[in-house]
């Protein structure tokens, strides 16, 4: 039985980790931390856990935590994670970091989009944790940079096209819409009910969203050369889910049926990627609460553009579910263990 710590358990990704790991047959969550709620049962912070998970939240003391667990999930904001991850690593613990701190390979790029990196020497050790693309590397890693939610939906949506050199990599435009849980649990005026309800708005417009360098880094690796994208995120009045609509120009004449066959071959055997039939498009309602990524593909024959639509639950495949998938690979467990989560519908 693996002993697991969740560092930063009072946010949405933290409680989602607790929900998933509670049903994992090979895991015991033995430590959960929260600076704001230390000393309280986690079920007092999240009443949904009442009677099933009443473990008491602790203060964040990395050495003490490392002494009593086998693996650590860090569900902290950026910067806070890189302040504690080195201690866990030095004490020989495998770490799955859900922040942005180890996703970007280049320290200067990270510094440009976030702030100076505190331990750039760890960046080469961190494996970007998309199992569908990095399964062998993840299995050998000690530090996983769990991907962001938007990047997961975009990268899985584009990987077959870029690897297959079907599209012009300079032509990529992404419109992505997320539920409000993607902004975290902290109190913000922009996320109040009256600010969000009955509205639909873009934000981070003009190439300034912090997920852009992460997306471009991974897409460039798939394409085999550097590329830039136009990425515009949107906030929609729902709790969870991401729908990414991805546009790109084809290198020649293509049919939707041929592209679907390409995707089916690329993701053959993947337990959590569902390529939809021609004429069927994804909905966030059909992946809610699950670790699935649903992908639909069509072609605008008038303009020669491929349109890919991908849907994920931002808290599961976009965060905590993918983190557990990575843990399974790191620990030599069946990849789907604890993740047989049917979507919640309606």
Curated annotation (Swiss-Prot):
GO terms for molecular function: N-acetyl-gamma-glutamyl-phosphate reductase activity; NAD binding; NADP+ binding. GO terms for biological process: L-arginine biosynthetic process. It is an enzyme of class 1 (oxidoreductase). The active site is at residue 149. It comes from the Bacteria. GO terms for cellular component: cytoplasm. Pathway: Amino-acid biosynthesis; L-arginine biosynthesis; N(2)-acetyl-L-ornithine from L-glutamate: step 3/4. Its EC number is 1.2.1.38. It catalyses: N-acetyl-L-glutamate 5-semialdehyde + phosphate + NADP(+) = N-acetyl-L-glutamyl 5-phosphate + NADPH + H(+). It holds the Pfam family Semialdhyde_dh. CDD domains: AGPR_1_C, AGPR_1_N. Signal peptide: none annotated. It is found in: Cytoplasm. Keywords: Amino-acid biosynthesis, Arginine biosynthesis, Cytoplasm, NADP, Oxidoreductase. Coiled coil: none annotated. The keyword Cytoplasm applies. InterPro entries: AGPR_AS (IPR023013), AGPR_type-1 (IPR000706), NAD(P)-bd_dom_sf (IPR036291), NAGSA_dehydrogenase (IPR050085), Semialdehyde_DH_NAD-bd (IPR000534). Catalyzes the NADPH-dependent reduction of N-acetyl-5-glutamyl phosphate to yield N-acetyl-L-glutamate 5-semialdehyde. Belongs to the NAGSA dehydrogenase family. Type 1 subfamily. PANTHER family: N-ACETYL-GAMMA-GLUTAMYL-PHOSPHATE REDUCTASE, CHLOROPLASTIC-RELATED, N-ACETYL-GAMMA-GLUTAMYL-PHOSPHATE REDUCTASE, CHLOROPLASTIC-RELATED-RELATED. This is N-acetyl-gamma-glutamyl-phosphate reductase. The gene is argC.
